[in-house]
């Protein structure tokens, strides 16, 4: 199983290193015979001798083309002859490529920016993560001492925790009497002990949570300061920290550094990405948070160190559990795309598609288009019309079906052969013409991207079929990861067409796909309404909610399935409308804002939920009660009564103060805040009293009654004394409770002023409610 590749230099020449696991053992293979190259298109082949004479300087040595050969390729499906130019060393290419490109006889150069080790994987047909080797994993985490205003890594590391299949342990240099804690004499000894643990356990995978941007850099800097050689690589190297866009990325040679943070950011949508929030979202269990100031206080006073050690141990354990959860999917993506898991786990979906296409282009002898320069990038920023959205029908509706197109955009790309190499192609016998935009796509041959996409969807169906047939739970899970990886990649192709930095960028393709998408959903809506008596309540891009007013649940379900048979017989190619769900009740507010409840009483909301921590418990609780009243009981008037009751209790100071606490996180050093929100004002007052505040600290506060700015009236919750303080009822009504429910009740004709307890007027409710069945 290939874990990764890189290259080193011996006697001025590159040597590819292949890090792999074979028969349970780690090994490194070497290849000294792979040469770097680029392609050049010449106006006249006779100019090749002039091109071979071009020289450049690199670190005091002269760089030139060492040999050239003429090769037949395809470019966007059309035959082309280019020159393959070979060089001595990969770094020769950036040194000389501009000079070659600027030569008058050169039309253009190609594939000059593909990293050498990645090029090797493509050309040799090698697939990382292929095979059934069992990989050893080890997660680690650090706790540090930080004081405001300090430079990064100025404070010591207090604890290093690690976890693997054998359990979790903590290394520290203060005496803590717990069975999973190993105590050493100094910070230096702690780092050395950790390095020894890694060497002895010899994991194939090191798992971190934001290790790219914190743990490794901190450890490396402290090691330098303390005179420790921070050796973690299997061939005796230190971790390599490199910039990747606006972030950093850390490589450990011979081991896969699997940083969960970018993977989880790409995979799931959460209001906050703390380790605690992620763990609760994935596993449904809360995890205790110990804040930086608490850690500092415990370390400096010696009180509460056991709690900090337990927290540190749990951090490593949770990171390990999350790693086990997410690693198999990334391994499948790595196999699918053909690049290392280290790269894939840090890639956007657009980059995943690009690496997949580069490999397939090589296999099909296609020359890859170049990435855009700055001028071309600016030109590509033009927008185009997106998917169809039908504005929602207001009111409370019952017996609702949700129908959507299976893989709408991939299906359109394949069905209509939407590809840069088929776009407006001359001399074709048959074309598909995109509605509204008029772009033509040749149907005489399968386009490069539609054919690849077709293969992917076909493979996914085979995997799903195999998954259904197998009774082995482990095999079933692996097959599920495979089909999900294929789905992620397949669903990214449409977005890739419109991705400005893409090699196979094609605005005409992207806007044609959305044009066909709009046509299909609009036609489908018209058919279900005119021929089957449905009313479509809300539609967005590839699906819609619909009901038959006055009909019972069984009638709606039966007619929906009849419609599916009817419409799918008419849809071309791979296009297929599917029955996705039935909801006994629902309402739709505006685009991407709705709430529905299924037959098991499970409520699904989109765009309405308040999950950020800067909403108080009273706001969240009131919104949940309002949703239940409307969706479970079908009673909008009851929902309004709930809001009036809560606002009345707030006005009369009958709400427990713990339900009014607002939590907000400090995200930068206090001195860097230009605007002073309530949480910043409270944090500054705490800091002035000597309490340690750092980025990541969560401030819990309550707003008091009085005049002046909110920030001046916000105090830490633990200072709130009901005998001395009164909360600002008006603030909580106007800024917490009403905003949480107003967006829901607006769908039934209510305005904010209609919801306060002292208001009695109601707005024509009957006009908004639909007949129940």
From Swiss-Prot:
GO terms under biological process: DNA-templated DNA replication
Annotated gene: pol
Enzyme Commission code: 2.7.7.7
Lineage top rank: taxon: Archaea
Lineage: Archaea, Methanobacteriati, Methanobacteriota, Thermococci, Thermococcales
Parts of the chain that traverse the membrane: none
Family: Belongs to the DNA polymerase type-B family.
GO terms assigned for molecular function: DNA binding; DNA-directed DNA polymerase activity; exonuclease activity; nucleotide binding
Reaction(s) the record says it catalyses: DNA(n) + a 2'-deoxyribonucleoside 5'-triphosphate = DNA(n+1) + diphosphate
Protein name, UniProt field: DNA polymerase
Task of the protein: In addition to polymerase activity, this DNA polymerase exhibits 3' to 5' exonuclease activity.
Disulfide bonds: 428-442, 506-509
Annotated keywords: Disulfide bond, DNA replication, DNA-binding, DNA-directed DNA polymerase, Exonuclease, Hydrolase, Multifunctional enzyme, Nuclease, Nucleotidyltransferase, Transferase
